[in-house]
Amino acid sequence: MSITAAQVKELRELSGAGMMDCKAALMETNGDIETAVDWLRKKGMAKADKKAGRTAAEGLIGIASKGLSAVVVEVNSETDFVARNDAFQTIVRNVATAALDTEGSVESVSASIYPGSEKTVEEAIKDAIGTIGENMAFRRSAKLSVQNGAVATYIHNSVADGLGKLGVLVGIETTGDKEVAVDFARKVAMHIAATNPLALTVADVDASIVEREKAIFSDQARQSGKPENIIEKMVEGRIRKFYEEVVLLSQAFVMNPDVTVEASLKDAEKMIGAPAKITGFVRFALGEGVEKEEVDFAAEVAAAAKG
């Protein structure tokens, strides 16, 4: 089959492998990008990608909090120009505010009342599309609540209050000092923004992901020619390392890389004055997993000339 330069470029960006290696991988996997990444990894030519996903959508991430709950939403626009528009930013902020009084799903938020009006969120967004003159979409939403403690929030590279390109929520349960607890949880939120963990604990990691990693590590280890019992130990070691890379509590804390997030939490309990537990987190990066349509500029000009 014919492999395009665009496919090779995309695989290089995802895998960090060389151009010819990427081309060979695509030929071997009939042009399937995700399978090609695995093929390269088995050959030892690519790095592990914790969350492969093409990021291309414009828009904003919005965060709002109230009491023991916080929400994070993503609203997409077609261009970054509109995302910088005050009217669009107001919409994202109001969608986040509306989400606080729901259970957090896109469906429930869309059906809720848009702040300051009698319309639903869905209706308000449709009206805004007509006013702003550009398509927009309320793509996703999540809510995090605690029973006794706090939910810390963090926006990376904020463009306005509660708005940016990446947002994180972290729940922390404790009966101790809430201000100290939320300050620590916010540092954990900054850590999550930087490291993008897959799960809170080892038990939370999707079993299919672990099996996939084991298969890749086994293939890599067998290339060493070592006996099966040694290969088994090598794979166990690689899986332990994998958990240290993708599990929040097992990761080296960005604020103090000499200790894990879990150990840092134990340390923080002394200042909090009571046991504390991170109960969950949510991380939204703008456009995660969305592939933007690529426009052939020459074809677009030709079409315009014809018509």
UniProtKB/Swiss-Prot annotation:
GO MF annotations in UniProt: translation elongation factor activity
Involved in Mg(2+) ion dislocation from EF-Tu, as annotated region: 79-82
GO CC terms of this entry: cytoplasm
Residues spanning the signal sequence: none
Keyword tags: Cytoplasm, Elongation factor, Protein biosynthesis
Subcellular location: Cytoplasm
Family per similarity comment: Belongs to the EF-Ts family.
Role description: Associates with the EF-Tu.GDP complex and induces the exchange of GDP to GTP. It remains bound to the aminoacyl-tRNA.EF-Tu.GTP complex up to the GTP hydrolysis stage on the ribosome.
Protein name: Elongation factor Ts
Species annotation: Bartonella bacilliformis (strain ATCC 35685 / KC583 / Herrer 020/F12,63)
